[in-house]
């Protein structure tokens, strides 16, 4: 049997609770903690959990819309749309305003020479 050698990276000291920054191209770049493999399944799991309730919500919304549509049809027979338009129009005045002509004030001023 062959012995397997386990390669371990040297332990890095944490500074202020996170890994130290690495210099790349003259600028400091911080390293991200954690494995990228672990984060991908969590995102997928969240999406699947969100899809299931949304389909149930869509069905309840559709049922509510059907109920509302039926009620709106009943209301349209009882209260026609023309009556609603008349109710929202601006009322006409019974007596028209008489607009008096403005007075012209002539101010006499000396002429310019």
From Swiss-Prot:
Organism: Xenopus tropicalis
Name of the gene encoding the protein in the UniProt record: dapl1
Purpose of the protein: Ribosome-binding protein that promotes ribosome hibernation, a process during which ribosomes are stabilized in an inactive state and preserved from proteasomal degradation. Acts via its association with eiF5a (eif5a and eif5a2) at the polypeptide exit tunnel of the ribosome, preventing mRNA translation. Plays a key role in ribosome hibernation in the mature egg by preventing mRNA translation, leading to ribosome inactivation. Ribosomes, which are produced in large quantities during oogenesis, are stored and translationally repressed in the egg and early embryo.
Quaternary organization: Associates with ribosomes; preventing translation. Interacts with eiF5a (eif5a and eif5a2); preventing translation.
UniProt-listed Pfam families: DAP
Protein name: Death-associated protein-like 1
GO biological process, one term: regulation of translation
Region listing for Disordered, in residue ranges: 1-55
Annotated InterPro entries: DAP1/DAPL1
Stored PANTHER family: DEATH-ASSOCIATED PROTEIN 1, DEATH-ASSOCIATED PROTEIN-LIKE 1
Record key words, sorted: Translation regulation
Family of this protein: Belongs to the DAP-DAPL1 family.
């Amino acid at each position: 049997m062959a012995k397997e050698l386990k390669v371990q990276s040297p332990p890095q000291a944490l500074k202020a609770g996170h890994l130290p920054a690495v210099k790349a191209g003259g600028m400091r770049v911080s390293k991200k903690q954690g494995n990228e493999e672990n984060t991908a399944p969590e995102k997928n799991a969240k999406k699947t959990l969100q899809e299931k309730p949304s389909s149930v919500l869509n069905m309840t919304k559709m049922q509510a819309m059907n109920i509302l549509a039926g009620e709106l049809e009943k209301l349209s027979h009882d209260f026609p749309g023309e009556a609603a338009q008349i109710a929202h129009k601006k009322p006409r005045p019974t007596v028209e305003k008489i607009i008096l002509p403005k007075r012209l004030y002539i101010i006499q001023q000396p002429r310019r020479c």
